[in-house]
């Protein structure tokens, strides 16, 4: 699963624009756009900014592993956002899920 789509899902779940998220994480808007469109991979330093930021820590485990640990406060964005972005597929349509 592409990190860019996951970061976009996090941004949408948090009701942030690209400029707002880029400012929070302290990366350029261009870097964020390219990442969300999977044109480029984030450097480790930038990726760590997402996992350490207080607003996005709850997504850190999911961002890195595709799994959640709700009992530890580690969640994924709302399923409808993931479905809309193609991160998961609706298994009621006969397609397999991610």
Predicted features by range, described:
Residues 7, 18, 29, 47:
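Helix-turn-helix DNA-binding elements, focusing on the entry/boundary residues of the two helices
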Residues 25-42, 46:
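Recognition helix of helix-turn-helix/homeodomain-like DNA-binding domains
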Residues 4, 29, 83-87:
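Terminal and domain-boundary regions
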Residues 60-98:
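Short, charged recognition helix plus adjacent turn
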Residues 1-14, 20, 97:
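A short, Lys/Arg-rich alpha-helix, primarily the initiator
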Residues 34, 52, 64-65:
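Phosphate-coordinating loops and pocket residues in cytosolic domains that bind phosphorylated ligands
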Residues 45-61:
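DNA major-groove recognition helix of helix-turn-helix/homeodomain DNA-binding modules
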């Amino acid at each position: 699963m592409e990190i860019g789509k996951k970061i976009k899902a996090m941004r949408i779940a948090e009701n942030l624009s690209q400029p707002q998220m880029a400012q929070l994480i302290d990366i350029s808007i261009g870097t964020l756009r390219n990442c969300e469109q999977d044109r480029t991979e984030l450097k480790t330093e930038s990726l760590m900014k997402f996992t350490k930021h207080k607003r996005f820590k709850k997504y850190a485990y999911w961002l890195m592993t595709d799994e959640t640990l709700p009992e530890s406060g580690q969640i994924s964005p709302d399923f409808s956002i993931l479905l809309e972005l193609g991160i998961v597929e609706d298994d009621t349509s006969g397609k397999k899920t991610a």
